Design a protein with these regions (language model features):
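C-terminal and inter-domain tail/linker signature
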Residues: 1-122
Length: 122
């Protein structure tokens, strides 16, 4: 399995509420992240993702594209927390050690209902 496929599968499982399974399969024990809302360790983000899965059980995640360059993978995607909520555009950058995610960065932006840009965000 290519690293970009691992990254997409990790996000799919986590967004679908299978956070522990995603972590057990794909996240290195020495994982660290750069999400400003949680401590930078593995366990704090895992717990935050589990809490999100409980709060938003109908969450929809779609990976739009993924790029792989050496030990780095970038996934451009979108998530909808509830069926009637707006889409949120996401970028995740993962650094791998072997076939496990060891570091992660992310950025998110709500998709505006109207935009002068005819190309859209995706």
């Amino acid at each position: 399995m290519k690293r970009k496929d691992i990254a997409k599968e990790f996000l799919r499982l986590a967004a679908g509420g299978k956070v522990r399974e995603a972590y057990e399969k794909y996240v290195h024990t020495d994982f660290r992240h750069h999400n400003p809302y949680f401590r930078g360790d593995r366990e704090s983000l895992l717990l935050g993702m589990e809490e999100s899965a409980v709060m938003f059980p109908d969450k929809i995640f779609e990976a739009v594209r993924a790029l792989e360059d050496g030990d780095l993978v970038a996934v451009h995607g979108r998530v909808r927390l509830k069926p009637d909520s707006p889409w949120i555009a996401l970028f995740h950058i993962f650094r791998f050690e072997g076939n496990h995610i060891i570091e992660e960065w992310e950025a998110a932006q709500e998709v505006p209902p109207e935009s002068p840009n005819k190309n859209g965000m995706f």
